[in-house]
Amino acid sequence: VILGAVGFFLIRRKVVSEEGLKTLSELVIGLFLPLLMFSEITARFNFRQFSDWWIFPLLSVLVTAVGYLFGLFVVALDRSLVSQEGPFLGIAMFQNSGYLPLPLVASLLAPDAVSDMFIYIFLFLLGFNMMIFSFGVFVLSCKGRACHFDTKDMFNAPVIATILALVVVFFGWTRFIPSFVSKPVEMMGRCAIPLSIIVVGGNLALIRIRSIQHVRPMLLGLVVKLLLVPLAFLVFVLLVKPKPLVGLLLMLQACMPPAALLSVIAKNQKAEEGLINQAIFYGHLASIFTIPLFLGLYGFFSGFFN
């Protein structure tokens, strides 16, 4: 919270410019986060211990699909949402899947469990990044008009770093990485989490909300994203009883507010930004209460935090 507040006030007080925050965000996405992913996976991942690694990208698709289906259901009930169906569905589908879960995990779990959860999250992000830059672009910009997106966007730096790390581990090449390379990579990767929280706070400060508009679609979108989706996964996890850390991963991802990337995609695709920006801003504020609520319910019924 403190780091997020620092990012927010650095931007609001113009200590850091909008261009400076953009550069910092690009460094986090393009350098520090990929290095953290590569470092953690090559140091701690092996295919025997994580034999079910391929499930995690599919879990990302599952979380997206549940949000999409809930969104379609609400649109079918309230036809006034049809005019903003794309942004509404984007809000329902895509969550802040990396910037918030990583620091939350680091603060909630013991060090050994944190390492495993980081790997789970990185594998989850493999599916998430490919989904948001393909299906996410389609949903936001292709309703009733021609659209296009560059498939190269699906293979961004975090995705490439994850795939490269898996290849290195698979062929046993980690032993050929000298310490004078692995140590700096690890040190720079550790910068990803605190910087990512500052970026989230800064991005919230950049969202310009002069007046609250699109109140009904925003509220309905946040009801889907922050209440219906986590409630559905709470029931799912309690019934299916997956491994404890897998259950926590699903609950964390299901509880997250709308992804800040939606605003970037909407701007690039010239889609409606107003609804998305408001949902991101107020969704992050509301999640201060909804995340502890659902994680508390999960811990109470599953006994995870006992």
Model-based region annotation:
Residues 1-306:
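Alpha-helical transmembrane segments of multi-pass small-molecule/ion transporters
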